[in-house]
Regions:
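Nucleotide 5′-phosphate-binding alpha/beta core
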Residues: 1
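Rossmann-like NAD(P) dinucleotide-binding subdomain of oxidoreductase/dehydrogenase enzymes
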Residues: 6-148
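ALDH superfamily catalytic-core signature
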Residues: 43, 47-51, 69, 118-210
């Protein structure tokens, strides 16, 4: 997306004298969870910088050190490339009260976390995009580029030991290409459990409490 235009004149209709202009929103308040504290911080930094917005992070208290380290890394690179000092900021000692305060003070909110935090973002009085629990399945059908699909799923699922909720938790494959996809997964280092192994895993991950 390097060449994708995100600011300035996007379209111009000279016949009607109409221009579509993209402009920054301002300062983004970003709520970061403990389950994916670095990748989400980096992602939100990049999309904010790409759209010429500043961003301030409220990390999860249990993962504040790595979230802040990730934010500092992106900030240093951005400043070295010519971005203003302080374009990326963070709360050193995060709390629920401070998270609520920055959401109310910012121009927009990007909230990733549990239902309570996402609800707070939507109740902040500012435009908000909330992201809750993942547990996402992936569907591969006949139209897919099988090699790319399988490779992308493996990369996603193995990133950060698969702890990110947005990582694919299951794959649904149409019958016509099932065996082809299965071979590609195995070829790329995946392991397919047999029935006995599946039952052993099921007993560990599923119990009376879910």
């Amino acid at each position: 997306y390097k060449q994708t235009k995100t600011c300035g004149i996007l379209e111009e209709d000279t016949a009607y004298g109409i221009k579509k202009i993209l402009e920054p929103i301002g300062v983004i308040a970003a709520i970061i969870p403990t389950t994916n504290p670095t990748s989400t911080a980096i992602f939100k930094s990049l999309i904010s910088l790409k759209t010429r917005n500043g961003i301030i992070f409220s990390p999860h208290p249990g993962a504040k050190k790595c979230t802040i380290a990730a934010a500092k890394t992106v900030l240093d690179a951005a400043v070295a490339a010519g971005a203003p000092e302080g374009i990326i900021a963070w709360i050193d000692e995060p709390s629920i009260e401070l998270s609520i305060e920055i959401m109310k003070s910012a121009d927009m909110v990007l909230a990733t976390g549990g239902p309570g935090m996402v609800k707070s973002a939507y109740s902040s009085g500012k435009p908000a995009v909330g992201v809750g629990n993942g547990n996402t399945p992936a569907l591969i059908d006949e139209s897919a580029d099988i090699i790319m699909a399988v490779n992308s799923i493996i990369h996603s699922k193995t990133f950060d030991n698969g702890t990110i909720c947005a990582s694919e938790q299951s794959v649904v494959i149409v019958d016509k290409i099932y065996e082809q996809c299965k071979k590609e997964f195995v070829k790329r280092g995946s392991y397919i459990l047999n029935d006995e192994e599946k039952e052993k895993v099921r007993k560990i991950i599923l119990n009376a409490n879910g």
